[in-house]
């Protein structure tokens, strides 16, 4: 990989690691850059997901205080995330590559919509927290919650982007606690999905992984995860969403252009 390309990937990984620790959707930063550099979509997806594991781990560790008292809930939900991640990775590796070419733009649009509507979702969750009727009972035992976490894992294993936003919304609605508690649990569940997905890629798609990309994103996202867990929460959410949305549109443009060739 050329020096300029490596620098671009490094800073994309740094920003993605920071964003993932705070709001999720870091893949909407790294994925467009990899596509713009001419890397095939599936190779870009699996290399990106593998590299971001380090950043996920850093973000999860940084939010460990917000996990206090959530151990039992995590033990109930983590298996669903892991199974979902394996399912999503299997779909990515076994469906024809042309499916990903057509599915990725639609998934990016879905992820961008989640980014755009995130503030309203968070306002709704906060309103529930302040309503005593919704604070009386923790609904984490519900089968629906487990199913939704599994489906978010499938989505994450197939296409990493914005699974964090999905999970924050799901956890915020179905469990008691604050947004920060939901975000901390999200970091653990996303880490689980990405670990099992990366393991699947290592076992069954080793030759399709771009290891230069993995190494650069691993180092830079690790640094970004530390930054995000410490000071990233002080950054303006509108600015973060604006950057994510702009880069997501770039990715969408590249993909549509490739489809029209």
Residue ranges and their predicted role:
Residues 6, 49, 104-108, 112, ...:
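Residues within membrane-spanning alpha-helices of integral membrane proteins
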């Amino acid at each position: 990989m050329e020096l300029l390309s490596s620098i671009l990937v490094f800073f994309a990984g740094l920003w993605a690691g920071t964003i993932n620790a705070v709001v999720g959707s870091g893949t909407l930063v790294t994925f467009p850059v990899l596509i713009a550099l001419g890397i095939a979509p599936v190779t870009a997806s699996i290399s990106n997901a593998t590299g971001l594991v380090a950043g996920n781990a850093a973000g999860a560790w940084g939010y460990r205080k917000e996990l206090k008292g959530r151990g039992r809930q995590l033990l109930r939900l983590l298996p669903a995330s892991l199974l979902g991640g394996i399912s999503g990775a299997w779909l990515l590796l076994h469906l024809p590559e042309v499916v990903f070419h057509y599915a990725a733009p639609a998934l990016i649009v879905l992820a961008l919509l989640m980014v755009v509507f995130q503030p309203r979702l968070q306002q709704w969750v906060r309103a529930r927290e302040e309503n005593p009727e919704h604070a009386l009972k923790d609904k984490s035992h519900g089968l629906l919650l487990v199913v939704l976490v599994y489906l978010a894992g499938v989505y994450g294993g197939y296409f990493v982007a914005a699974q964090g936003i999905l999970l924050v919304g799901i956890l915020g609605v179905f469990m008691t606690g604050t947004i920060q508690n939901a975000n901390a649990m999200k970091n653990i569940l996303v880490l689980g999905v990405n670990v099992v997905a990366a393991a699947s890629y290592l076992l069954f798609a080793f030759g399709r992984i771009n290891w230069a990309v993995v190494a650069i994103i691993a180092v830079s996202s690790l640094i970004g995860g530390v930054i995000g867990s410490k000071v990233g929460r002080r950054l303006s959410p509108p600015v973060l969403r604006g950057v994510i949305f702009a880069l997501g549109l770039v990715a969408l443009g590249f993909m549509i252009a490739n489809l029209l060739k």
